[in-house]
């Protein structure tokens, strides 16, 4: 499953979509709580390092320590979120589905750079489902995650995982799409 789109579809070269989580921005991270912000920064650094390793030696498997660091950062974030008494205890169904998919697919070390890249984007999507649509200073509650285009587009993660455009926008008001 290629969550960033298939090779050759991205402007800037045939592998421009690989490790797309390396393009995260401080503006996006500012929308997150502390635990999510730490995770997003770690994921961006891991993705950048993995992409540089891929460019240098594309035929080699990704370094297992990169996946280990990503799992550790994700586990730390989940632990901090679980310990935060101010957050609601329930997890929306779509977030539970993504977490279940993460658990199912992410047990062994990734065998390729594409596989590692896909796992990192899945982790990023789970994270964005947590802050998208939440009110932040100066933004309305229906404000979408500013990285929503990564997930909610034809061929994006929502379409590939759920065969639907679920996005990571507003929590509570489902988006509607016209059928052609």
UniProtKB/Swiss-Prot annotation:
InterPro entries: EHV_Unk. Phosphorylated. It is found in: Virion tegument; Host nucleus matrix. Keywords: Host nucleus, Late protein, Virion, Virion tegument. It comes from the Viruses. Induction: Expressed late in the infection cycle. The keyword Transport does not apply. One of its GO terms (molecular function) is zinc ion binding. Pfam families: Gene66. GO terms for cellular component: host cell nuclear matrix; viral tegument. Belongs to the herpesviridae US10 family. This is Virion protein US10 homolog.
């Amino acid at each position: 499953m290629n969550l960033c789109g298939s090779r050759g579809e991205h402007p800037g070269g045939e592998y421009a979509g690989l490790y797309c989580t390396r393009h995260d921005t401080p503006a996006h991270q500012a929308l997150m709580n502390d635990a999510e912000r730490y995770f997003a920064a770690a994921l961006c650094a891991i993705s950048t390092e993995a992409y540089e390793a891929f460019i240098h030696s594309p035929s080699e498997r990704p370094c297992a320590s990169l996946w280990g660091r990503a799992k550790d950062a994700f586990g730390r974030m989940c632990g901090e979120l679980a310990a935060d008494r101010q957050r609601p205890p329930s997890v929306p169904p779509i977030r539970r589905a993504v977490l279940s998919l993460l658990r199912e697919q992410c047990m062994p070390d990734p065998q390729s750079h594409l596989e590692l890249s896909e796992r990192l984007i899945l982790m990023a999507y789970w994270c964005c489902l947590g802050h998208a649509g939440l009110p932040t200073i100066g933004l309305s509650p229906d404000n979408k995650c500013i990285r929503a285009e990564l997930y909610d587009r034809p061929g994006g993660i929502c379409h590939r995982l759920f065969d639907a455009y679920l996005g990571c926008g507003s929590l509570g008001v489902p988006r509607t799409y016209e059928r052609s």
